[in-house]
Amino acid sequence: MTSGFLEFTVSLSAHPVTDAERESILAEPGFGKYHTDHMVSIDYIDGRGWHDARVIPYGPIQLDPSAIVLHYAQEVFEGLKAYRWADGSIVSFRPDANAARLRSSARRIAIPELPDELFIDSLCQLIAVDNAWVPRVGGEEALYLRPFIFATEPGLGVRPAKQYRYLLIASPVGAYFKGGINPVTVWVSMEYVRASPGGTGAAKFGGNYAASLLAQTEAAANGCDQVVWLDAVERRFVEEMGGMNIFFVLGSGGSARLVTPELSGSLLPGVTRASLLQLAIDAGFSVEERKIDIDEWQKKAAAGEITEVFACGTAAFITPVSRVKYGDTEFTIAGGAPGEVTMALRDTLTGIQRGTFADTHGWMARLG
């Protein structure tokens, strides 16, 4: 197979799963539990650039124990989904935005940038051999694509590596939360922070997620599904949820207003977030990006001014938030039921991604 940037070699798996095994997995995929038969690998060496692009059987990789990624976490990743349309084509939602964000993340972690064209080609190459893993038309299922770059050079000196590897793996997925579109309960972390100004919060960097795990454990211990992060300086402004951006709906009907935390440099610029802002404008809603105080959230929810809250991201898609906990405080949003604005935006975005609504912004890209 030939890319416009590099030529890909293809080595097919000698032991792919059977059709029956695959269908059994696709019937109940979970999230990230199973992987397709193949993966993409591309190497980088300083002075030579990206090279040796190949599709190979999915399996363990060999890594030196002193590889810089294992000691200094020089790694970035992305996440996007592939969908099967009724006409048989396989498409993805705004992969160009994921390619651009991977480059932005790489710059922040001193990793060489993977060209957008090569990123998109890698998706197409994997879909070409593993297209049978893309779930059936309709439903909540999709094929989750996980591209990532990590430092492979051995050495214990603290410096950017000179050798890297790009891998692309894929996993069939269902709903991110067990309850599907049922509203979730969130825990506001008052003790821990995810990121700080000037840090790595705007990069899709594994270290940010590692830093969130203790708070996520705390959330689970308090009967919550996810963590809400506050800013690192004043510890009062809502930033995002674990791996997701957050939206607040004030008012209802055609006069509803959507508010989401502004991109401060310490939260992730989500592709779904940006898309929902545009879709809200298309639907005639006013939108605002600004700081949102946790006290404002509580008071306006109690007064009935905040009528809906939802989280959004590639993995969790659009998930309503019904209940909020922190310390001895607990409150609900509008009785805890999913809101009309939330569900309308969810239906619109779902329709675009599944090919049943008009893609007026040209967001869908064919992969196979």
From Swiss-Prot:
<keyword id="KW-0808">Transferase</keyword>
<dbReference type="GO" id="GO:0009099">
    <property type="term" value="P:L-valine biosynthetic process"/>
</dbReference>
<dbReference type="GO" id="GO:0009098">
    <property type="term" value="P:L-leucine biosynthetic process"/>
</dbReference>
<dbReference type="Pfam" id="PF01063">
    <property type="entry name" value="Aminotran_4"/>
</dbReference>
<dbReference type="GO" id="GO:0009097">
    <property type="term" value="P:isoleucine biosynthetic process"/>
</dbReference>
<comment type="function">
    <text>Acts on leucine, isoleucine and valine.</text>
</comment>
<dbReference type="GO" id="GO:0052655">
    <property type="term" value="F:L-valine-2-oxoglutarate transaminase activity"/>
</dbReference>
<dbReference type="GO" id="GO:0052654">
    <property type="term" value="F:L-leucine-2-oxoglutarate transaminase activity"/>
</dbReference>
<keyword id="KW-0663">Pyridoxal phosphate</keyword>
<dbReference type="InterPro" id="IPR005786">
    <property type="entry name" value="B_amino_transII"/>
</dbReference>
<dbReference type="GO" id="GO:0052656">
    <property type="term" value="F:L-isoleucine-2-oxoglutarate transaminase activity"/>
</dbReference>
<comment type="similarity">
    <text>Belongs to the class-IV pyridoxal-phosphate-dependent aminotransferase family.</text>
</comment>
<dbReference type="InterPro" id="IPR036038">
    <property type="entry name" value="Aminotransferase-like"/>
</dbReference>
<keyword id="KW-0032">Aminotransferase</keyword>
<keyword id="KW-0028">Amino-acid biosynthesis</keyword>
<protein>
    <recommendedName>
        <fullName>Probable branched-chain-amino-acid aminotransferase</fullName>
        <ecNumber>2.6.1.42</ecNumber>
    </recommendedName>
</protein>
<comment type="pathway">
    <text>Amino-acid biosynthesis; L-leucine biosynthesis; L-leucine from 3-methyl-2-oxobutanoate: step 4/4.</text>
</comment>
<dbReference type="InterPro" id="IPR001544">
    <property type="entry name" value="Aminotrans_IV"/>
</dbReference>
<dbReference type="InterPro" id="IPR018300">
    <property type="entry name" value="Aminotrans_IV_CS"/>
</dbReference>
<feature type="modified residue" description="N6-(pyridoxal phosphate)lysine">
    <location>
        <position position="204"/>
    </location>
</feature>
<comment type="pathway">
    <text>Amino-acid biosynthesis; L-isoleucine biosynthesis; L-isoleucine from 2-oxobutanoate: step 4/4.</text>
</comment>
<dbReference type="InterPro" id="IPR043132">
    <property type="entry name" value="BCAT-like_C"/>
</dbReference>
<keyword id="KW-0100">Branched-chain amino acid biosynthesis</keyword>
<dbReference type="InterPro" id="IPR033939">
    <property type="entry name" value="BCAT_family"/>
</dbReference>
<dbReference type="InterPro" id="IPR043131">
    <property type="entry name" value="BCAT-like_N"/>
</dbReference>
